[in-house]
Amino acid sequence: MALTVTWLPGLTHDWFTVPGKGNFSPSSLRNWLSLLTHVAGHSGWPHLVTNFSLILLIGPMLEESYGSLALLVMIVITALVTGILNVVFFTTGLMGASGVVFMMILLASFTNFSRGEIPLTFILVLVLYLGDQLLKSFGDGNISYFAHIAGGFCGSLFGFFIPPRRY
């Protein structure tokens, strides 16, 4: 689906982009659906390949650790959070799975840790990732670094409050 969406720019803009602040119409079913579907829309081939390569790399480990349903719920929540925040705070549209990717990156650091401890990998990834995203936020205006940060925040919360399955 994401490949088709990426190759059909009109479809991507109409159905797979969350409108920005002032452009979201509460009476539009398409706008409400875009709060979830924006993660399938991508600005081009490099954007799609980068996001889905990381999802394919990290996703199976998280699915094994948390289960398919729990991971799906985390993805849906992250999509909703990034979409809603974009509608509330930003005038530009939002598309792509980068928020989901960063949720997965930070969640992955929690897969093998003891409760009551903060994993060192989490601290390192958080510092490197957050620093990188904050620095980049002063550059290219076409990338929603805020969505990346919001996705990472979701992954951090999921990691702290949803324990991985133990076998």
Residue ranges and their predicted role:
Residues 1-167:
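A detector for small-residue-rich transmembrane helices and their helix-helix packing motifs
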